[in-house]
């Protein structure tokens, strides 16, 4: 226990210690360690926690880390989330982690199934019991935490939560003064009301507050998209091209790019981890609009006066009227 608690501010150190990298006869016998992009993000989290420690030394409160990652297929997203789950549960005893996804099927058969795989390989797997939709401390460990640390364990878990856009309040209610992490898998498919409710999870001044959203970027609208655009001032972001990731078959991705072309939306979404240029209900693609906005126009007093009108129909969009000659 003491050794693992020493990795409280070092997720990479925990991951390297807790799993059997390169050990013969295990699922990781041919894997030397986490992938480069995963290590980069572990470091980002560690750096954020160190910054919070420095803030605490001068009497300032820490802050949540909001992290959005947009990627192509097959980079190891679920594996990375699972490693994070086990680090938080093991090194932040008493913490609460909430995991959700775009569908309950994704949540149950992909995200939480992956957590089960990593839990089975972990050096401290005897600390926790894993079910299809949660991971909680075993009775002996819960008793130890309650007796030695005088800490209630009712909210000490990694819990998979499904959601309903019509009843978002059912998703609310989780709080922790020890540590709070929320993960969105395939975040592009999670509706705005759930994002709104999640913001309330981080009101307690816990020393660990992480909101991790990760997805293939299937839509160029919605809150996941806005993490990289309108709301990018609040989020730390990253794009991951699948072809840059070790341990995957690069030929598969090159075949997709060769078939559709580098700038096709299929290549952007499935390989590059970039948002599609055109949405399903979008007549003019975003790239075309951005190029037009950046284009230098020479005024011609003899040309006809042209009015352009873009009528907003829903959400926070605004109607625009523009005159040009």
Which residues are covered by each model-predicted region?
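Phosphate/NTP-binding elements of NTP-utilizing enzymes
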Residues: 1-309, 321-325
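Primarily the active-site beta-strand->alpha-helix module of PP2C/PPM metal-dependent phosphatases
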Residues: 313
């Amino acid at each position: 226990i003491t050794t693992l608690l020493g990795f409280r501010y070092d997720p990479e150190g925990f991951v390297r210690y807790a799993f059997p990298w390169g050990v013969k006869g295990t699922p990781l016998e041919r894997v030397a360690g986490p992938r480069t992009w995963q290590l980069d993000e572990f470091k980002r989290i560690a750096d954020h926690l160190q910054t919070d420690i420095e803030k605490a030394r001068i009497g300032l409160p820490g802050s949540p880390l909001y992290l959005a990652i947009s990627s192509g297929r097959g980079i190891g997203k679920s594996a990375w989330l699972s490693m994070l789950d086990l680090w938080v549960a093991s090194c932040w005893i008493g913490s609460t982690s909430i995991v959700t996804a775009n569908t309950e099927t994704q949540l149950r058969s992909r995200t939480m199934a992956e957590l089960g795989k990593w839990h089975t390989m972990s050096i401290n797997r005897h600390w926790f019991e894993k079910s299809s939709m949660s991971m909680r401390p075993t009775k002996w460990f819960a008793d130890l935490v309650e007796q030695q640390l005088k800490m209630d364990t009712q909210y000490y878990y990694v819990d998979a939560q499904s959601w309903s856009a019509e009843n978002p309040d059912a998703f609310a209610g989780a709080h922790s003064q020890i540590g709070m992490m929320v993960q969105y898998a395939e975040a592009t498919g999670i509706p705005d009301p759930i994002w709104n409710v999640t913001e309330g999870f981080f009101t307690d001044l816990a020393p660990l507050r992480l909101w991790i959203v990760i997805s293939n970027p299937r839509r160029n609208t919605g809150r996941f998209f806005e993490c990289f655009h309108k709301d990018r001032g609040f989020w730390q972001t990253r794009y991951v091209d699948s072809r840059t990731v070790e341990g995957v078959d690069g030929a598969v991705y090159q075949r997709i790019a060769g078939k559709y072309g580098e700038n096709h939306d299929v290549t952007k979404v499935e390989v590059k981890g970039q948002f599609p240029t055109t949405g399903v209900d979008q007549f003019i693609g975003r790239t075309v609009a951005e190029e037009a906005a950046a284009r230098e126009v020479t005024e011609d007093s003899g040309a006809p006066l042209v009015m352009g009108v873009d009528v907003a129909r829903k959400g926070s969009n605004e109607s625009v009227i523009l005159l040009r000659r």
